[in-house]
Swiss-Prot record:
Gene Ontology MF, one: ion channel regulator activity
Subcellular location: Secreted
Tissues expressed in: Expressed by the venom gland.
Organism: Pseudonaja textilis (Eastern brown snake)
The keyword Secreted belongs to this UniProt entry's keyword annotation: yes
Protein name as annotated: Short neurotoxin N1
Length: 11
């Protein structure tokens, strides 16, 4: 998963 500016996206 990717963490970007406090945003977590499960891909």
């Amino acid at each position: 998963l990717t963490c970007y500016k406090g945003y977590r996206d499960t891909v």
